[in-house]
Regions:
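Glycine-rich His-Gly loop
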Residues: 75-77, 101-106, 269
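Primarily recognizes the serine-hydrolase "nucleophile elbow" in alpha/beta-hydrolase
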Residues: 173-248
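Loop/turn elements at helix/coil->beta-strand transitions in domains of secreted/extracellular proteins
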Residues: 95-98, 124-127, 186-188, 209-213, ...
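The feature captures the conserved acid-bearing segment of alpha/beta-hydrolase catalytic domains
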Residues: 224-289, 293
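Cap/lid segment of the alpha/beta-hydrolase catalytic domain
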Residues: 94-95, 100-169, 226-228
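Bacterial Sec-dependent signal peptides at the C-terminal "C-region" and cleavage site
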Residues: 9-25
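Positively charged n-region of N-terminal signal peptides that target proteins for export
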Residues: 1-4
């Protein structure tokens, strides 16, 4: 067991590796390939992926030491995704790692944690790609955030599988964009998912072998039939997760595919009632590790897990010291060392938002949840919503049909 630095002095944080393996029949490489193909087919993820066709709209400077590009790329059903790429300025002399932010419900590239990640990690010497989830931001018909529009879609399992596939494809195509960037080391790409995003990354990390490391926060606790994830938001989580029943032990298969791909960390607060962590604690994760190792044929590569204390809830923990230290060991931030990370100051996000303009959902900014996040502090400046627009109003009015949920829904319901 490895001890990590505490988020709060009285609360130890731990990260636990897998226990010794019991004898079992592991998946073969051929079976792993077939399972990835079956999962992609189940969610209508195009195989092969389409060309990303990146289109840059503008470049800007969001903070000292950081430059940014606002661009779009192609995803499922010919739709486009608005995105921002944050880069260190100046660029390091050698290629840099990269991190993809996959948002939770109500999240998009405007969300405080997307922006904060962009500035923090870019200053650490990494590229950071953030994007709008379907129905949010510049993928919303009214260009609004925190709408949860995708939850309002009617229909059953087929549309839900299409929706989950869209979210998976969005994330995979973000990786495709990063692989094409000359400044990015394609072997050092990580992906972080928060809340609903943790579900998306759990699936994406199972099927996309280009991703080196995955971080799951506010989730990753995939459970069995009739559990939290089967009963959660039906269109983006519940029905899609139920549709994977053909896998058998869904968590073990998904995480065995992760283990074959690369490192994964699930990190949660023990007080996170949003995704049932109080009943999915250490015993739950240990058992899931054991089952995963049996399918993988080794404890090597099996996911790590860690916890903050019982007064720590639903938060994007990749901004906190223990998870950044884990990421440093996986992708090696170009401007940081582990010693530098250990010495960095921290700031409670509720204090940061009290003194800096930022975009957040007020009901999430509570001490137990996002407001209590103890993020590494590199003097991240505030920002306004429009500073993170990809397009001008005139451009968006002209091009919005390529982005919005209504167009996507029409295309998947009435394919040509």
């Amino acid at each position: 067991m490895k001890k990590l630095l505490p988020l709060f002095a009285a609360i130890p944080l731990v990260l636990i590796a897998a226990a010794p393996l019991r004898e079992t029949q592991p998946l073969t490489t051929k079976q792993e390939v077939e399972l990835r193909e079956e999962i992609c087919s189940n969610f209508f993820v195009p195989q092969p992926l389409p060309p990303v066709d990146m289109k840059t709209y503008r470049t800007f400077v969001p903070a000292p030491g950081v430059k940014a590009e606002a661009f779009s790329y192609v995803t499922q059903a010919g739709m486009r995704v608005p995105a921002i790429l944050y880069l260190p300025d100046p660029l390091p002399a050698t290629k840099i790692p990269a991190f993809v932010v996959v948002n939770g419900h109500a999240g998009d590239k405007y969300s405080w944690y997307s922006y904060y990640t962009g500035i923090l990690f870019a200053r650490g010497g990494a590229a950071v790609l953030t994007y709008d989830q379907i129905g949010e931001g510049e993928r919303n018909i009214n260009r609004k955030s925190a709408t949860r529009e995708h939850d309002t879609i009617g229909g059953g399992s087929v549309i839900a599988r299409h929706l989950a596939g869209l979210m998976i494809c969005d994330a995979m195509q973000a990786v495709s964009c990063l692989c094409q960037r000359p400044e990015v080391d394609a072997n050092r790409i990580a992906m972080g998912g928060y809340s609903m995003g943790s579900f998306v990354v759990s699936l994406t990390g199972a099927v996309d072998t280009r991703v080196h490391a995955c971080v799951l926060c506010g989730g990753g606790d995939l459970d069995g039939p009739g559990g939290y994830w089967d009963k959660s938001k039906p269109m983006c989580q519940g029905l899609p997760y139920q549709s994977l029943d053909f896998l058998g032990d869904r968590p073990a298969v998904i995480y065995a595919l992760h283990a074959a791909r690369g490192p994964t960390l699930a990190f949660n607060g023990l007080g996170d009632t949003v995704v049932a962590i109080p009943t999915h604690g250490e015993d739950f994760f240990k058992d899931m590790q054991t089952r995963t190792a049996e399918l993988h044929g080794s404890t090597n590569g099996v996911f790590d897990y860690g916890f903050a204390g019982t007064d720590c809830g639903h938060r994007p923990y990749w901004l906190t010291r223990p998870v950044v230290e884990w990421l440093q060991r996986q992708i090696a931030f170009s401007n940081w060392t582990e010693d530098k990370i250990k010495a960095m100051p921290q700031i409670k996000i509720s204090d940061w938002t009290a003194t800096h303009p930022a975009i957040f959902v007020k009901s999430f900014m509570k001490p137990l949840t996002e407001g209590g996040t103890l993020a590494l502090d590199v003097n991240v400046p505030g920002y306004t919503h429009d500073e993170l627009n990809m397009m001008t109003t005139e451009q968006w009015d002209h091009e919005k049909t390529n982005y919005i949920l209504e167009t996507w829904l029409a295309r998947v319901q009435n394919p040509e």
